[in-house]
């Protein structure tokens, strides 16, 4: 795996990526084929499911509403896990709209095996 900061930067940027092909390729690089992305109200499984999840979030929050996702603070990781906080705010600037954190469990190949997403606000 590349260093944690680079990995997290790529992870955050995928949620802002407008190009579907670039999203698809990056998802395959970051997630294992049978990975799970879990949030309180949904479960996305495998590359196709995760691609749909990310594309849906992009369409709703970035493209339609003009927001951007970015890292909030530092990241931490050990024993094959990464913890990061993120925030969503208008791309043009303004107040933070939403805050959350993701906890990523990595496989032996350094790709995400399971990602847990928690919306805090």
Model-predicted segments: where are they?
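Short charge-dense sequence patches
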Residues: 1-10, 50-54, 110
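Short acidic-aromatic low-complexity motifs
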Residues: 2-30
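Hydrophobic alpha-helical core bundles mediating ligand binding, dimerization, or RNAP-core interactions
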Residues: 8-11, 15, 31, 54, ...
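A solvent-exposed, acidic/Ser-Thr-rich amphipathic alpha-helical stretch
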Residues: 24-80
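A beta-strand edge to alpha-helix "cap/lid" segment located at domain peripheries
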Residues: 59-121
């Amino acid at each position: 795996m590349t260093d944690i900061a680079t990995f997290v930067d790529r992870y955050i940027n995928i949620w802002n990526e407008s190009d579907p092909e670039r999203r698809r390729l990056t998802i395959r690089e970051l997630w294992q084929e049978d990975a799970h992305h879990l949030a309180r109200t949904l479960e996305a499984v495998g590359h196709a499911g995760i691609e749909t999840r990310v594309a849906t979030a992009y369409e709703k929050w970035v493209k339609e509403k003009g927001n951007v996702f970015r890292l909030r603070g530092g990241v931490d990781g050990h024993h094959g896990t990464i913890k990061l906080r993120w925030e969503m705010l208008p791309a043009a600037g303004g107040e933070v709209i939403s805050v959350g954190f993701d906890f990523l469990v990595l496989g032996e190949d350094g790709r995400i095996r399971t990602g847990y997403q928690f919306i805090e606000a």
